[in-house]
């Protein structure tokens, strides 16, 4: 039997909030120049990542429109772009085109440079931010990799390489799970449940972040309330509430309320609450241009916002999810991964993606701190997120790259 790659793409978004990184105040001018170059490289791939995000979201909705959806398009795209370094022919073309890159418009070197700088930006230290990504390459100890591939995944994608004895599947699982558990600060344990006996190579990607709301909710105002999953199902949820100044407005073309909430730093969460029966219309209409306008045209108004505390997750078989986007050959016996190793023919045996989203009141460094603001005396609108809504987490520093995309159908599941 031909050996196969078992590829676990792993992701944790532990998010009370999210903040990307800043340069230190005493950063030298050369550092600022370097950051500007990184930003420009990120800008080149940001539109492609945005298109990929919405394409994949719609595909996941098509496969299941009655469950929570949550994934990191940046994480998935990074992992497959890294894998593409070892592919050739149709396999190679399918991956890059499936991720939304037209190589007649952007050079492949620019694609990898964009991901390289994206990862550098995410992993830059900041005292307001816990945002880290990591790539791990786990190689069977008697498998010889092509030097060029090994060098490129290390240099372009900051991937660590580990020698593993895959014939001892329990030990291999322990090594891989330990790498992930450490990288996600213990938030994801036992990611790998089983390994195919023919596995000779595993690629693992994770992303972890946790941040703080710029304007937190007061936990004393959180009360149990109804959340309407659908016309026949209602669940009880802890509902956060705050009367204050919000970037919230009704968009008639989407038949939806749109709420933008900032995290400390350069990240923004966009929550979109459609009118009853308008979720499908919203999902078909939403695109990167509309989101771009929301992020550009910011204004606040007084509002009374109710938002559920939640912790949801999504686990996906990417073979099924990416098939309609044209990424198929890498999973088949016709896969050409000869850029990884010439020892044995390989195919991608398994690609699993997991993401977790947590939202609560926390938003200040000091426990029990109080946030106060002055609001106009006019009657504010009530915006109650007590039915399914869409959530998108954007990193403004990396040219509005969508870090996470999801739909909350049931906050209790």
Swiss-Prot record:
<comment type="similarity">
    <text>Belongs to the serpin family.</text>
</comment>
<keyword id="KW-0325">Glycoprotein</keyword>
<protein>
    <recommendedName>
        <fullName>Alpha-1-antitrypsin</fullName>
    </recommendedName>
</protein>
<comment type="function">
    <text>Inhibitor of serine proteases. Its primary target is elastase, but it also has a moderate affinity for plasmin and thrombin.</text>
</comment>
<feature type="region of interest" description="RCL">
    <location>
        <begin position="368"/>
        <end position="387"/>
    </location>
</feature>
<dbReference type="GO" id="GO:0034097">
    <property type="term" value="P:response to cytokine"/>
</dbReference>
<feature type="glycosylation site" description="N-linked (GlcNAc...) asparagine">
    <location>
        <position position="165"/>
    </location>
</feature>
<feature type="modified residue" description="Phosphoserine">
    <location>
        <position position="33"/>
    </location>
</feature>
<keyword id="KW-0722">Serine protease inhibitor</keyword>
<dbReference type="InterPro" id="IPR042178">
    <property type="entry name" value="Serpin_sf_1"/>
</dbReference>
<keyword id="KW-0597">Phosphoprotein</keyword>
<feature type="signal peptide">
    <location>
        <begin position="1"/>
        <end position="24"/>
    </location>
</feature>
<feature type="glycosylation site" description="N-linked (GlcNAc...) asparagine">
    <location>
        <position position="266"/>
    </location>
</feature>
<keyword id="KW-0646">Protease inhibitor</keyword>
<dbReference type="Pfam" id="PF00079">
    <property type="entry name" value="Serpin"/>
</dbReference>
<keyword id="KW-0732">Signal</keyword>
<keyword id="KW-0964">Secreted</keyword>
<feature type="site" description="Reactive bond">
    <location>
        <begin position="377"/>
        <end position="378"/>
    </location>
</feature>
<dbReference type="InterPro" id="IPR036186">
    <property type="entry name" value="Serpin_sf"/>
</dbReference>
<feature type="modified residue" description="Phosphoserine">
    <location>
        <position position="378"/>
    </location>
</feature>
<dbReference type="GO" id="GO:0004867">
    <property type="term" value="F:serine-type endopeptidase inhibitor activity"/>
</dbReference>
<dbReference type="InterPro" id="IPR000215">
    <property type="entry name" value="Serpin_fam"/>
</dbReference>
<dbReference type="InterPro" id="IPR023796">
    <property type="entry name" value="Serpin_dom"/>
</dbReference>
<dbReference type="InterPro" id="IPR042185">
    <property type="entry name" value="Serpin_sf_2"/>
</dbReference>
<feature type="glycosylation site" description="N-linked (GlcNAc...) asparagine">
    <location>
        <position position="65"/>
    </location>
</feature>
<feature type="glycosylation site" description="N-linked (GlcNAc...) asparagine">
    <location>
        <position position="102"/>
    </location>
</feature>
<dbReference type="GO" id="GO:0005615">
    <property type="term" value="C:extracellular space"/>
</dbReference>
<comment type="subunit">
    <text>Interacts with CELA2A. Interacts with ERGIC3 and LMAN1/ERGIC53. Interacts with PRSS1/Trypsin.</text>
</comment>
